Amino acid sequence: TTLGNISSWVAQDLGASGPVLSHSITCSTAVHAVLNGIAWITSGMAKRFLVGGSEAPLTAFTLAQMKALKIYSKGGNYPCRALDMAKQTNTMVLGEGAGMACLEPGRKKGALACIIGVGYATEPIAHGASMSADGDCLKRSMEMVLNGIPPDTVDAVVMHAPVTLKVDRAVMEAVLRVFGKETPALTTNKWKLGHTLGTSGILSMELAILMLRHQHFIEVPYLGKVSGPEKLERVLVNAVGFGGNAVSICLERGTL
């Protein structure tokens, strides 16, 4: 009931008259909302859909959970070391925030970006927070989104990279299995924002859109100078959630 009330009050504030719904699918919640909105529009049941995610996990209870799991960062320079494959310990740092986007069908003039493909998958898990060592669910979601999109046309990938040793290795393995030697430039925003859990997917989409609009690859500072693409036309966004689920969304540069 509390969860549903969040979306209904957003609708009330905006004066929306269409359907209102909420869901919670752990760290991929926001991008599952994007999938949901696409389904409503594709079915003809909605002309446009407002989608997004919100999370406020900076509570004593949630922090205690993360520390009990022994995945929380001990601090230092850049305490949240997403994509640092040389790190020896878990470096989770929680963040909070919210993000929303308006989806419309077709290619609209002035659109920030265009969604040209989506993928999703679920894998069997050993326990609630586990993921296979090779990131099978993410591999399959990327293969689905790239069905019809040549992998070598993807200029960058916004990684999920939750900054735990096991899952960081798993998501990297999945990307390497899909792209191989043609792996695009990789980036993330978690070093700056922390892991915003259910909001993280929409904030990753925001990062992708910013790079596409400004034609500037945003690198991770502690990884050293990365040779980013000279031109950005397509960016793949990945999200993984507890429960063995993954979502991949490919964004293409919009026409402003």
Task: Please place each PLM-identified region on the residue numbering.
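Condensing-enzyme catalytic core mediating Claisen C-C bond formation in acyl metabolism
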Residues: 77-151, 155-156, 256
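A beta-strand-loop signature enriched in Asp, Gly, Thr, and Trp
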Residues: 127, 138-192
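Short, high-confidence coil segments that cap the C-terminus of an alpha-helix
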Residues: 46-49, 154, 232
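Conserved small-residue
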Residues: 10, 30, 37, 66, ...
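Active-site-proximal alpha-helical scaffold in enzymes
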Residues: 3-7, 14, 20-55, 93-109, ...
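Active-site-adjacent elements of ketosynthase-type condensing enzymes
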Residues: 56-82, 121-140, 162-174, 199-207, ...
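Fold-independent oxyanion-binding glycine-rich loops
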Residues: 13-14, 52-55, 96-97, 105-106, ...
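Conserved catalytic cysteine-centered active-site region
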Residues: 1-36, 68-93, 166-203
